[in-house]
Amino acid sequence: MIVDNLKLEKLIGKGSFGEVYLTTKKGDTKFYATKKFDRANIEGTEAMKYLKNEIIILQHLKHPNIAKYEDVKKTKKHFYIVMEFCNGGELSKALEKYQSKHGCSFSEEIVQHLMRQIINAFQYIHKLKIIHRDIKLDNILLNYETEEDKNNLNLMKATVKIIDFGFACKISKTGLQYSTLGSPINMDPIILKKLKSEGKTRQLGYDQKADIWSLGTICYEMLIGKSAFDAQDMDELVNKIEDGTYVIPTSVSKEVISFLNGMLQYESHKRLNCEQLAKHDFLTKNIKDFHKIDVKKVSGKITGEGLNINVKKNRTIWAIFNSEDENKLSKIGGTDFTEPIEEKEEIESKNSGKNINESFPMQNQSAYSGPMLPNPFQGIPGNPTNQQIYGSSEQEMAQEGYVVKGGIFD
């Protein structure tokens, strides 16, 4: 398909509201990722608001660890959002492949390499007074310089790219936000509490420290291979976070425990900010100099080989976490658009001899998802609706300055 100077070469992903295509531009040898949205399905919906919001925010973000926005086009039937293409796909998929290949989650060295870049990106985002509000492994892409590194899953050579700013917002004049947006399993306890109460706790506000909690949850998932607060439904999730305990095997270093504890604090004011995290020993020290926990030196009764950390009471206790359990761990878990332009269907797609089908296989779920988001509790009894998870009322969004007219950066 030809859209202006774009050539949509191959479908590489699908989502709730649209599709993602590997794309080339006339006179350009680079690949791009183009999100295609059906206007009949998206115009007048909440998803359209998120789409406009994402475009406006991305136009103002320029950072090596944030996927670059390239262009937006409109035809009579579709919207097209052109983004930087990242050949490594989603970080969540990389973790699954790594676990399948090596039988374990990422090493501390790999997590250190990835978290340095992620924290670097969020230092930049937070300095612009923006809250992302939907940090999860699906919304982090990887890019490799060589096909060999990509094929060998050489994560130490991977560059991180943050995506999906549809739910992002600029901090209000009060410094707090109130709407319930995001993915529950990575959600700040305050937002989750509001979500569970169906918005009745309006007085509970949050700031950029909400992102810090989410960063803690993805860091944990990369290290341990599962969610810190693994749950089958909303009630169980809320109860686990309210209890405030997550388990870390004693094979990890003290630096890792301290790093996680700096993010996964129930009370947001106790969490470290991005500047503090960037200077933390886990990100600045050589892995070889890390201190491993010696169980024999820990006072008190040892009931197993794991450390329970209570994020609500900010204390630590020892609990059962044996090697058999550890082996079972696995991932569970207003912008101005151009006037409509013409779309041209092509029966065959040729691109300078590049084998598109072999180099870029179809993905089961789309990266660059934008508003094309699944319900993380779909099919689970007692699960919240998409509206509860992903959006607040239009009135509440307007009160935050979230519904954009002319741009949130005006």
Question: What name fits each language-model region?
Answer:
Residues 19:
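Conserved N-lobe ATP-binding subsite of Hanks-type protein kinase domains
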Residues 71-72:
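A short, aromatic-enriched beta-strand patch in the conserved N-lobe beta-sheet
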Residues 77-90, 94:
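Conserved short submotifs of the Hanks-type protein kinase catalytic core
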Residues 120-130:
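Protein kinase catalytic-loop region centered on the HRD/HxD motif
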